[in-house]
UniProtKB/Swiss-Prot annotation:
Gene3D superfamilies: 1.10.150.530, Aldolase class I. InterPro entries: Aldolase_TIM (IPR013785), Methyltransferase_A (IPR040072), RlmN_N (IPR048641), RNA_MTrfase_RlmN (IPR027492), rRNA_lsu_MTrfase_RlmN/Cfr (IPR004383), rSAM (IPR007197). This is Probable dual-specificity RNA methyltransferase RlmN. GO terms for cellular component: cytoplasm. It is an enzyme of class 2 (transferase). Binds 1 [4Fe-4S] cluster. The cluster is coordinated with 3 cysteines and an exchangeable S-adenosyl-L-methionine. It comes from the Bacteria. Reaction proceeds by a ping-pong mechanism involving intermediate methylation of a conserved cysteine residue. It is found in: Cytoplasm. The active site is at E99, C349. Residues 105-344 form the Radical SAM core domain. S-adenosyl-L-methionine binds at G171, E172, S203, S227, L228, H229, N305. Disulfide bonds join C112-C349. It comes from Lactococcus lactis subsp. lactis (strain IL1403) (Streptococcus lactis).
Length: 365
């Protein structure tokens, strides 16, 4: 006999922008200011139920409950690192799981959110792609990741708030574009969480260069990061199969369009893999690729977090990383070696989720 899993069909109200919430309220016979009150309860007072919205009528609260849920996520696992990094595993209403990471930075609290359940991009070094994409994460489910992290501080009476967001968790954000854009507009709204656009970064592997061009016209000051990891097509294809359909020539044509349109800097993420992409010769190739664009470029060299399923890859040595960095600096490239977070927990993106799913399967076996 199999257990019936009841799946919640109501969407999370967190998935609506303020304008969408106002439109919904008016369509349901309410005044515009009622939607503004709901928005205030959600993001300024950060209530945990519609019933706590004390200046709304019982009839309106019933209507909200009929159409929406508030928080669709359930906390399953929390891992805390000695450096203050916290990794969360959340369960979605359909029993699927996603990861979220809180990082304490010198400039504030940064949260890394997940946009897809699994990933189909097929990067050969990444834990996220071990389990293929099941579905997109909705805008409400992405916002809920921020709200649950913020709840941790609110419940403890701590005067701290999430100040920065990086969309670099499991999945490819531009493969979930509509929900991504709603999420960004919700958290950036000055009347809500008010997370500054320049404090938000979206990362893409560039699998669809046209999406980078589309992003250039969204009229947001949000930062763009490119998961690059190699300066030539042959090497990049061996690491990231999406390069077959989106070679560097197409990718950089879109990036150049983006920078010309927005005049905003692009960050290039480059994971340092021992013996794969960390030689001085490859560093020079990277410098040659970035140099014509250096005014609006920044290279982020990232120490690799080993993944059990990808045993062929090892972290580049500190010496090789330093030599690579020196080549870039000698060529005038703006670059940094990224500070590590959560090295004493399941630090690699997707690692905690993969472990939990294996554990659940073992229990059922």
């Amino acid at each position: 006999m199999t257990e019936n899993i009841i799946t919640e069909t109501r969407p999370s109200i967190y998935g609506l922008t303020r304008d969408q919430l106002i439109e919904w309220a008016i369509e349901n016979g309410e005044k515009k200011f009622r939607a503004t009150q709901v928005w205030d309860w959600l993001y300024r007072k950060r209530v945990q139920s519609f019933e706590e919205m004390s200046n709304l009528s019982a009839a309106f609260i019933d209507k909200l409950n009929e159409h929406f849920i508030l928080n669709p996520l359930e906390q399953v696992v929390v891992q805390e690192s000695a450096d203050g990094t916290v990794k969360y595993l959340f369960m979605l209403p359909d029993q699927m799981m996603i990861e979220t990471v809180l990082m304490r930075q010198s400039y504030g609290l940064s949260v890394c959110v997940t946009t897809q359940v699994g990933c189909n991009m097929g990067c050969t070094f990444c834990a996220s792609g071990i389990l293929k994409k099941e579905r997109d994460v909705t805008a409400g489910e992405i916002v809920s990741q921020i709200m649950l992290v913020q709840k941790y501080f609110d419940e403890r009476g701590l005067d701290e708030r999430v100040s920065h967001v990086v969309v670099m968790g499991i999945g490819e954000p531009f493969d979930n574009y509509e929900h991504l854009m709603n999420f960004l507009r919700v958290i950036n709204d000055d009347n809500g969480l008010a997370i500054g656009a320049r404090h938000i970064t979206v990362s893409t592997c560039g699998f669809m260069p046209a999406k980078i061009k589309e992003f250039a016209h969204e009229n947001l000051q949000i930062n763009l990061a490119i998961s690059l990891h190699a300066p030539n097509n042959e090497l990049r294809t061996s690491l990231m199969r999406i390069t077959r359909n989106a070679p560097l020539e197409k990718l950089f044509e879109a990036i150049d369009y983006y920078t010309e349109t927005t005049n905003r800097r692009v960050t290039y993420e480059y994971i340092m893999l021992s013996g794969e992409n960390d030689s001085p010769e490859i560093a020079q190739q990277l410098a040659d690729l970035i140099k014509p664009r250096n005014k609006l470029s920044y290279v982020n060299l990232i120490p690799y977090n080993p993944v059990a399923e990808h045993i062929k890859y090892e972290r580049s040595t500190k010496d090789n990383t330093a030599k690579f960095y020196d080549v870039l600096k000698k060529n005038g490239i703006n670059c940094v070696v990224r500070q590590e977070h959560g090295t004493d927990i399941d630090a690699a993106c997707g690692q905690l989720r993969s472990k939990q799913i294996k554990k659940n399967k073992a229990k059922l076996a």
